Amino acid sequence: LESNHVLDDVSATFPTGVSVGILGLNGAGKSTLLRVIGGAEPPDRGSVYKDVRVSWPIAFGGGLHASLTGRENTRFIARVYGESPAKFERFAEEFTELGRYFDMPLRTYSTGMRSRLAFAASMACNFDCYLVDEVTATGDKRFSSRYRQAFKERLKAASIIMVSHNSQTIRQFCTVGAIIHGGKLKMFGTLDQALAAYNQITM
């Protein structure tokens, strides 16, 4: 059978301290690329080298355990990343506003509640680079506003690699651009160059 490569022989260097926006059409492989960079999904060939502390894709719940409570999940993640479990737990409990559900297993959570916990876990860690799949909304406008504010605070001392099909979102957060198309990733020297090339694809 002929194999279909989502990412075909992709090779790229992401500069430290630079926020990179990766544009691509729906289904181009943007989310797959982020999962590979973050370590949530291994590449079929080659390797990913990181010399800074990189987050998992924000709002990606793959590292959360359905049988554990919200509190237990946050303490587990804190230990894995060398953070203070008590401080991590306190931040997540206050930030998510899950109430009694914070002490209930994740299998009882709605999708929005799981997203809240995943957001909080991401914000509780001081990463050098955050991986962002769009600026994910939770369906709760008030919480989404709080999340964006917390995210902007983190970006004062960190960079991001963001994937999106929305050029306005990329322009809001990023300074350098790239395009993923046909399984290939092309880096550009400036964001304007990337946006111009992306506009050609979408025309």
Which residues does each predicted region cover?
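Conserved catalytic loops of ABC-family nucleotide-binding domains
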Residues: 150-162
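Conserved H-loop
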Residues: 59, 165-173
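ABC-family P-loop ATPase nucleotide-binding domains
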Residues: 3, 53, 58-149
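Conserved beta-strand-loop-alpha-helix hinge in the C-terminal portion
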Residues: 146, 184-203
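ABC ATPase nucleotide-binding domain signature region
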Residues: 16-79
